[in-house]
Amino acid sequence: MYNLTRLSNKKLTIRINIVTVTFIIVIIMVIYSLLLKQCRLSSDSSNNSQLKKQKYRLLILILTAPDNMKERVTLRKTWLSDKSDNVKHLFVIGTENLQLENHETLQSEQLKFKDLLLLPKLRDAYGTLTKKVLQSFKRIIDEYDFDYLLKVDDDSFVLIHKLLVNLDTWEAKGYRKELYWGFFNGKAQVKRHGAWKESEWNLCDYYLPYAVGGGYVLSYNLVKYIAMNADNLRLFNSEDVSVGLWLSAVANIERRHDIRFDTEYRSRGCSNDYLITHKQSPDSMKALHDYYTATGNLCSKEFSNRMSYHYNWTVPPSQCCVRKPGII
């Protein structure tokens, strides 16, 4: 009888131990599960923080060619050196079919300056400029947050701080429209010959009103609209003409023609009122920057090469743009 009682107590002890061990294992598993979940949440939070887009007041896209190292160096040393932290610039370059040596040079430049937007699926050429702009818009919408975009060429000189002041003034007036700002042309005849010929243009005898390509500003939502509809847009040889066409049917836009944008295919001269002046060589870029830094004026002597115009939005585009003396 004693042995049976002893055996029964022993079995009970074993059962209690099994229950205790099982309970401990369950507790450990619950704690481990909670810790794992916390780690995942922490990791997700860290990843989300890393993926958060940097916000800029102004994002500057500068179209440049792979071999235009001198132009990029000049811009970094001149007007880009004056930009504030809320301004981001990117040199846009297509890298498809580049020779290995060119790739290595660009990679070295990227490591040093971290300001290249490289497009691996774009062959960099005059005939692909519109694709270049379109692919750039898609990339920056994915990777950056910004209020306004300035698109310029690598031979354009820009007074960034004056652009920013003008943007602040425009917003302070309470406008609720999207901004398309530049030097507009509404009566440019369709090119049928040469590098910029448009064999596919069949909309009308003239290009639709557009801001010429030496420099123009778009508000964020317009860039996003183009990027989101990229697969459905018609592409023409001239990127500035294409942008004007893409935005032609969009409502709630202020098309702001500004004679302070010297952004046509050749410069109109030099004026201390200019915000952007196009077709500048590296040497003239340095001279403009040095003189502006020393005096606060862009020109040592103001002059005009050709007449300008105020855009008349009340008449048909073919009558919009009458050049007159006395306009910068």
Which residues does each PLM region occupy?
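Secretory-pathway lumenal glyco-enzymes, predominantly type II signal-anchor Golgi glycosyltransferases
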Residues: 2-328
